[in-house]
């Protein structure tokens, strides 16, 4: 029996943990206020996996859930205190070789003023703030309309 490899990421109201076990069977996930226990049989050889995690902060076990797919089991843990950042998943600072941060899904939501806004909306908003309005009065720049010679118009000295 060994722990299943897992990836995790943090959101404003939830913490997500994905246990990477293909063809899992007999999946058992137990949510407690400050602990998560995961077990299953995985792969073609029905290898037994067991993970016990003492969580960094408390969760709401009644509002936490999991979903099994052919490739993994995704656990959605409802935070006990919404909006509280989790710098790590576990209570202990020890590095666990089976646990890593899911940087593909990681988002620095603390600096994000509107989490629900889609990427397209952000792009559209950014484009709206770009130039292109003809009614905008731009400040005068000295020499912008001059036809005088610039320093790059001068002849370069020959190389020796």
Swiss-Prot record:
**Residues annotated with N6-acetyllysine modification:** 33
The protein's predominant localisation is: cytoplasm
Acidic residues: bias regions = 133-153
* UniProtKB keywords: Acetylation, Cytoplasm, Fatty acid biosynthesis, Fatty acid metabolism, Isomerase, Isopeptide bond, Lipid biosynthesis, Lipid metabolism, Phosphoprotein, Prostaglandin biosynthesis, Prostaglandin metabolism, Ubl conjugation
Position(s), cross-link Glycyl lysine isopeptide (Lys-Gly) (interchain with G-Cter in SUMO2) = 35, 65
**Pathway the protein takes part in:** Lipid metabolism; prostaglandin biosynthesis
Record-marked site positions (Cleavage)? 142-143
Catalyses: prostaglandin H2 = prostaglandin E2
Keyword Protein biosynthesis assigned: no
Q: Where is the composition biased (Basic and acidic residues)?
A: 122-132
Identify this protein by name: Prostaglandin E synthase 3
């Amino acid at each position: 029996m060994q722990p299943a490899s897992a990836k995790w990421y943090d959101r404003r109201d939830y913490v997500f943990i994905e246990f990477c076990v293909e063809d899992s069977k007999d999946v058992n996930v137990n949510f407690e206020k400050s602990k998560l226990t995961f077990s299953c049989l995985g792969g073609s050889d029905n290898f037994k996996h067991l993970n016990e995690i003492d969580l960094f902060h408390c969760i709401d076990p009644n509002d936490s859930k999991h979903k099994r797919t052919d490739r993994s089991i995704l656990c959605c843990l409802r935070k006990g205190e919404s909006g509280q950042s989790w710098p790590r998943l576990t209570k202990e600072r020890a590095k666990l070789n089976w646990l890593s941060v899911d940087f593909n899904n990681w988002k620095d939501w603390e600096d994000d003023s509107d989490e629900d806004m889609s990427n397209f909306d952000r792009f559209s908003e950014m484009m709206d703030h770009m130039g292109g309005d003809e009614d905008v009065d731009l400040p005068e720049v000295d020499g912008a309309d001059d036809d005088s010679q610039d320093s790059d118009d001068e002849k370069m000295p020959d190389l020796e």
